[in-house]
Amino acid sequence: MSMLHPPRFALQAREGNHLRLASATGAAIELFVLEEDIVRVLVLPDGELRGPATWSIAPGTDDTPFDGRDRRDLGGFALPPFELQVDADTLRLETGKIRLSVALAGGHCAWAIRQGGQWRAVLSDRATQAYNFGFWDAQVYHYVRREPGEMYFGLGERAGELDRARQRYEMRNIDAMGYSARTTDPLYKHIPFYLTWQPEAAAGFGLFYDTLADCSFDMGRELDNYHGPYRYFAAQHGDLDYYFIASPDTPLDAVRRFTWLTGRPAWMPRWGLGYSGSTMTYTDAPNAQERMGEFIERCREHDILCDSFHLSSGYTSIGPKRYVFNWNRDKFPDARGFVDGYLERGIRLCANIKPCLLRDHPAFAEADKAGLLVRDAHGEPAWVQFWDEVGAYLDFTNPDTVAWWKAHVKHALLDYGIAATWNDNNEFEVWTPDAFAQGFGKPYPVREAKVLQTQLMMRASRDAQREHAPSARPFLVSRSGGVGMQRYVQTWSGDNTTSWETLRYNIRMGLGLALSGVSNIGHDIGGFAGPAPSPELLVRWVACGVFMPRFSIHSWNDDATVNEPWMYPQATGQIAALIKLRYRLIPYLYELLWQSTQAYEPVLRPTFADFPADRRCYAACDDMMLGASLLVAPVVEAGQTRREVYLPAGARWVSYWSGEAFEGGQAVTLPAPWDEPVMLVREGGVIALNVAEQHFDRRGDRRGFLVVPVRGAGVAAGGCIEDDGETEAWRQGEQGRWRVQAVSDAHTVTLSVTQEGRMPARADTVELFLPAGEARQVLAPQARVLEQAVAGGWRRFTLQLPR
C-alpha cells in the first residue's frame, strides 16, 4: 500500500461493544468498548489477525486458559453503554470517562478523558503515518504525538530514571548478569505498558500493547523534523493491539486498572515475606550439604530470623555443569535428611530450576524422542547457548512437555519436601530464525512469542505445586516474565552488580515494576555479581531491602566471598536488628500484599502517585511510599549519617524512630544511623506491627498498631488481614481482619479496635502506639486500658479487648 493512498475507513459492523471499521484496501480497525475507563484498538493492515491468542488478558480473574484466550473474547468486561456518532469524516464514541475520535481517512485516533466534568484532550496519533498499513515492512508501529511536559512511567523492569521521557527501551528478554542498573537495556522482563502523566493538568492515561513479540519503545529520544515531536511503539511481529486506560485523578487509577486487566496477583504464603537466605557458593561447594547446615548454625548463633532459603542450581551439578532435576549425591548424600533438617527449623527451601536441557543431560534423549523440545525447520532440536554449554529449551506449548515438567517438579523436588520453585534462566533466548513451537496444535515461530514460554513455564511449576499440595498456597519465584506474571510468581531484578549506584537505581527499577502491575518484588541485597560489598554498603542495602516484598541476600561474588548477614562482625548486630525490624513490619507488608491481590494496589510507589498535586514529588529522588501510609527514604550514598527527605504536602508526617511530627511541603534532614532507616508515618495512617519479641529459636506473633491521629477533626483508620498464612482456606472465608480507628476532635482522640470475621486466633489484648506529642485526651470506650507508657517518642496503650 502506498502512503499516497492511505486507507479510508467506514463503519462495517457493530456487535454490541465491538465495532469494525473496514476499508477498500482490506485494512480494518476494530474498537472494543470494554469499561467506562478502558477502550481497546486493534489495527489489522490485512483485515486479519496475525498474532496468536492472548495470555495477558484476565480481567479480575486468576488466570487465562492454558492454551490462551481468544483475542475477541469479551468475557469478564462490563461492556458499558456508550454514545456513537458517525459522520463523513469522523467516528466518535463516548463513555462516561473516555471520548475517542477516529478520523476515517487514515484511522488516526484522538483521545480525551473526563476530568472534573470537562473533557481534556490527552493523546493523539501522529498526523503522519501513525500506523504501518504495509508502507514499509511487516513490523508493527504506533506513532503518537509527544506533548511538552509529559512524563512516562512503567514499561516494567528498566534501568535508569523512573521517568522514561527521552529514552529508548527494548523488550528482548536476555540474561543480563552484572547489568548496570543505570544504563543496561534490555533486561529480563517484557511488560509493554506505560503511564503518561501530565503534572500541570494532574491527568493521564495508560497504554498497554498486547504483544508477545520482541518490541521497543522510543519515548522521545528519536527526532525527525518531518513529523514533529513524537514517541512510538514498534514490534517485530503480530498485531497492533492496544488498550487505552483513563487515569483522570491519580496515576494509580491506570496502574490499578492495568493490574485488574491482566489478572489478580497471587496471594502467597506469609512466610514468603521473611528473610530468605541465598548464595551460589554453598551449593557449588563439594561439601554442599555441610555448608547448608552451617548456614542454619550461623543464623542461630547470630539470632538471624529466617523463613526460607533459595537453593541455587549447584545441587543439580555433574562436574561443572547444571542439569535440572538432577540431585548431586556427592554434594547431598542425604537429600531428604537435608530438607527435613531445614523444615525442622522452620526454613523452607525454594529450589532453582531451569527450562533448558543441555545436550548431555541424562534426560535429553528421552525428551528429544518425546518431542518435548523447541525444534528447527528440520525437526532437530533448536540449539542454543546455555551457560557454558549447548542445549535446547523445553516447549511449554506442548501439553506433553507440561506433563513431563510437572512430573519432574513433583518427583525430584516436592516429594523431598522442597516447598517452592525458583524458576530461573528462563528468558528463552532462542535466536534461530526457523525455530518453532507446537503452539497447542498450531505451530508458530518461537521468535514471535518467546516470553509465552516463560509464562507457561512458571504456570506449569505453579500447577505442579498445587497438585502436590492442594491445600497449600503456592510460592514461586521467577526471574523473567511478562504481562500477567503477577498471577503466578514473586520476582526480583535479576543478577545485579555490587555498587552504590545499583542500590540507588534498583529502587527506581522496583518502582517501575510496581507501576506496571508487578508488586511482589525485590532485589539481590548486597549485589549478585562483582566484588564483595563494603560493610556500610551491605548494611544500607539490607536497610533498604527490609521494605521490599522479596527480602533476600544473594551473591556470586568475583572474589569468592559470600554475602551473608555475618560476613562483617562489626556490622552483624546491626543487620540482625534490621532483620528483626523487617519481621516487626510483616503484618503491614502482608496487608499491602492483600490489598494488591484484592484491590490491585501497588505495594511500592513513588511519592507522586499518592500526592499528584505536589509538583515537588515529581523530581527524581530515592524516596518511596510503602503503601499509602509509610514514607521510606533509603540512604544510597557512602558516608551519610543524616538523610534529607522531602515530605509531600497535604499531610503531617511522624518519624517512626522519634515520634516527632513534621509539616508536609518541606524538606527535613533526619538522623540516619545504619540500623535505623529513615521512615515516616503519614497523618491518618495506621501501621500494623508484630510487637512480640523475636528470636531464631523462639518466634512470636502479637499485634500492635502505630496510629497517627488526624490533627483537628478527622479519622485515622487502618488494620490488617489475618489468616493461617499458608493454606487456601481463605478462599472459603477462613480469614479475619483487625480494624483500628482513631476519631479526633479538638480535645479528644477516641480509639476503637475490633476483630472481625474468622480470626485464626482472637486476641485478648492489643498495643496501640500514638505519638508522644499527642496532647489531647485519649479515650478507649470499648476497651480497658491496662497500661500506658512512653518510650522512643511513642505513647503505648495496652488495651484489653472485649470478648
Predicted features and spans:
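N-terminal accessory segment at the very beginning of proteins
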Residues: 1-262, 268-272, 278-280, 287-297, ...
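Generic detector of short, aliphatic-rich beta-strand segments that form the cores of beta-sheets
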Residues: 678-681, 803
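Catalytic-domain carbohydrate-binding cleft regions of carbohydrate-active enzymes
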Residues: 4, 12, 117-675, 682
